[in-house]
Amino acid sequence: MTVLVALFCLVTWTLCTRIPQYSTQGTQQPQQPEKTPHPHPQPEDAFPPTHATDLKIHDPSIIHVDGTYYSYSVGRHIRIHQAPSLDGPWERTGAVLNADSVIPKGDRKAPWAPQTVHHNDTYYCFYAVSNSGCRDSAIGVATSKSPGPGGWTDHGLLVQSGTGKGSDEHPFTSSNTIDPSVFVGEDGHGYLMFGSFWSGIWQVPLDESLLSVAGDTSSEARQLVYMEKAPLPASKHPNPLCREPSGARPIEGSFLSYHEPWYYLWFSYGKCCKFDTKNLPPPGREYSIRVGRSKSPRGPFVDKQGRDLANGGGEIVYASNRDVYAPGGQGVLTEKSGDILYYHYCRYPVIQEIEVDADLTVNKSTSYDFWV
């Protein structure tokens, strides 16, 4: 089945330097980076090339409303940027929250990995609070009648793991409640996907308000992505909420989309950040974008070899190539022209272990079939 996917690429904040300074005027193209041998070379036609704009961002969520594009990303109180087109010019216009998250755990000032959806004349921004490397985490939600800054109400806790109410119930006893993603079908049923490392990616149904889990989570939860054999060693952290006794499984950042007649579950696999060019992970261990599909939003999702994503499957859609290193943190924006897969990546060469701004890129003319 042919799927039209335009690549809307966001160079991640994490660990990327030698990033050219881009003009913020109109849609002027960026300077080309220095030609440097890639640590994991790919054939030139292995993946579509990228195209940069002026947006500096990390972990984006993109929606399109009445001719304006809105981007939501990690940052103080969840940053909002707006633009008249995906090319830009992008302008930071404010934040979702007008104060720290009301959830009393994790990084309340700068919630992680937000995702914004529109349903029943309301905008919902789902976000996570946590501390890096630990699963004492929570997912919250804010709502507004408009997508821009101002007018948002923080409803607080939706689900949590590690500590707090409900964290002693399955699947929160073994999962990490970050990287929220919500899908609402044409029938109005909503589903929350979440998870990072530990027991992989899970899904629970939401009630009609999208503000609470529907039914009993123990019986309704579905494990969507997992691998039995952990590819990374176990942590020796003294806090049991910050170690994985059976080893680490680098699975996170899920996103569910629909392209008739299939539901596609996208996720990121591998090391996302804190790279050292003198000691890069083995080829294939850095971030890449993977996918599976199902005839049901509840799964099971399989790759084109028929492997269940809950048993180690996952079709690689985009990986390191050219000056792209460790792409991930993806989402899908459905436009009249087709489905736009957007994500962030590190621009190679990656040369130091600090966080810096990075840049939005877009390719709106790439058509490829990742399932054949």
Swiss-Prot record:
Reactions performed catalytically? Endohydrolysis of (1->5)-alpha-arabinofuranosidic linkages in (1->5)-arabinans
The biased composition feature labelled Low complexity covers: 23-34
Concerning SUPFAM superfamilies, the annotation shows: Arabinanase/levansucrase/invertase (SSF75005)
Report the Pfam families cross-referenced here.
Glyco_hydro_43
* Single GO MF annotation: arabinan endo-1,5-alpha-L-arabinosidase activity
Major subcellular site:
secreted
Catalytic positions are: D59 (proton acceptor), E252 (proton donor)
Question: Which named protein is this?
Answer: Probable arabinan endo-1,5-alpha-L-arabinosidase B
Could you tell me which species this protein originates from?
Aspergillus fumigatus (strain CBS 144.89 / FGSC A1163 / CEA10) (Neosartorya fumigata)
